[in-house]
Regions:
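A broad "ordered helical/assembly scaffold" signature
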Residues: 13-17, 29, 53-56, 79
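Conserved AMP-binding/adenylate-forming core of the ANL superfamily
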Residues: 50-101
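Non-catalytic terminal regions with compositionally biased, polar/charged low complexity
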Residues: 17-24
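Active-site diphosphate/adenylate-binding microenvironment
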Residues: 24-33
Length: 103
């Protein structure tokens, strides 16, 4: 499973972040045939996760908050929108977004 292999490697590095020699000597790169950040990491982490993921305080004092689950749902909506425009797996696209919560 890509998620668990990645998390295991990440956790090892975090546990040894102040011990460079051990981290360098014992770290093993996870064997990942394929890895998709959105599907293999973020979606797994976001599944039924109602913890706060993003909290933006605007200049006027208003706030925008989103949970991991909400961000995952919105990401899926954008992916489906792109699919509807004809974007296929493997296509390269560039999206320019402002510094704001809505995609």
């Amino acid at each position: 499973m890509s998620y668990s292999a990645f998390v295991q490697a990440r956790d090892f590095l975090q546990a040894h972040r102040t011990d460079y020699e051990t981290a360098y000597r014992e770290f093993k790169w996870p064997e990942l045939n394929e890895f998709n950040w959105a599907l293999d990491y973020f979606d797994v982490m976001a599944a039924n996760n109602d913890r706060l993921a993003l909290w933006v305080v605007n200049e006027d004092g208003s706030e925008q908050k989103m949970t991991y689950a909400q961000m995952s749902k919105r990401s899926n909506q954008v992916a489906n929108w792109l699919r509807g425009l004809g974007v296929k797996r493997g296509d390269r696209i560039l999206m320019m977004l402002g510094n704001e919560v809505p995609l």
